[in-house]
């Protein structure tokens, strides 16, 4: 770079080792897990998620087929997949897929909004420090909070009383907006998954710089 009179990098990210069963992967040991095999079995985004999530900034990462399957089932299928499916199913069942903001709010809504706002700031902070695993964990913590929000607001109970119709709409609106913002944050890590979420929710794709919840 100096010979070409090009600027030198101001920081270099040196990632840790990726271990298989506690040992460094080696062809001679026959313990290598190939990315192509993971992609064939789980897809590109799931492979991205595992590698990013399991390689913290300062520690060696550990990979086993058992752990890959566990992450796929627990994080991608259960936490994220079920959240999106539940939200879409309820929106379709109760409002034909079209939810709106009604202004019938509760304290739990403000807590969810605070988590959404805090997640965007946390992701930015972690990425500035090259802590990619922490950043993606923060996004999934938001999805966990959304799942908890469903349990707290019990939309299926609200649906039984016509008087709670507007409250039900507000709950599903908050969920849809929060998941959409979460998908926007996720896009840098799992682009295909994020786009699928936005398309399934039938919402407008959001840019990273505009990931905020409406105040009115």
What are the roles of these predicted feature ranges?
Residues 11-14, 198-200:
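Beta-strand segments within the central parallel beta-sheet cores of soluble alpha/beta enzyme folds
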Residues 16-107, 204-208:
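Catalytic adenosine-cofactor/nucleotide-binding cores of aminoacyl-tRNA synthetases and other
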Residues 160-208:
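C-terminal, helix-dominated tail/subdomain
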Residues 120-133:
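Long, non-coiled-coil amphipathic alpha-helical linker/lever segments
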Residues 84-123, 147-164:
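Conserved, charged catalytic cores of large soluble enzymes
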Residues 2-10, 129, 189:
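Secondary-structure transition/capping motifs at alpha-helix termini
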């Amino acid at each position: 770079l100096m010979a070409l009179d090009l600027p030198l990098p101001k920081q270099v990210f040196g990632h840790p080792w990726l271990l298989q069963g506690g040992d460094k992967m080696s062809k001679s040991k026959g313990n290598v897990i190939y990315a192509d095999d993971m992609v064939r079995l789980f897809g590109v985004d799931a492979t991205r998620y595992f590698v990013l999530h399991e390689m913290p900034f300062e520690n060696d990462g550990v990979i086993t087929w058992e752990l890959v399957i566990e992450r796929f089932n627990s994080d991608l299928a259960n936490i994220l997949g079920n959240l999106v499916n539940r939200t879409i199913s309820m929106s379709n069942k109760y409002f034909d897929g079209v939810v709106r903001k009604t202004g019938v709010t509760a304290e739990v809504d403000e807590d969810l909004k605070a988590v959404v706002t805090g997640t965007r700031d946390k992701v930015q902070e972690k990425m500035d420090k090259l802590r990619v695993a922490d950043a993606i964990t923060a996004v999934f913590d938001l999805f966990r909070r959304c799942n908890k929000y469903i349990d707290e607001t019990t939309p299926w109970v609200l649906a039984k009383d016509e008087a709670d119709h507007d409250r039900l709409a507000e709950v599903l609106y908050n969920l849809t907006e929060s998941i959409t913002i979460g998908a926007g944050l996720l896009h840098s890590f799992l682009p295909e998954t994020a786009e699928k979420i936005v398309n399934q929710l039938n919402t407008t794709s959001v840019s990273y710089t505009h990931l905020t919840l409406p105040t009115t």
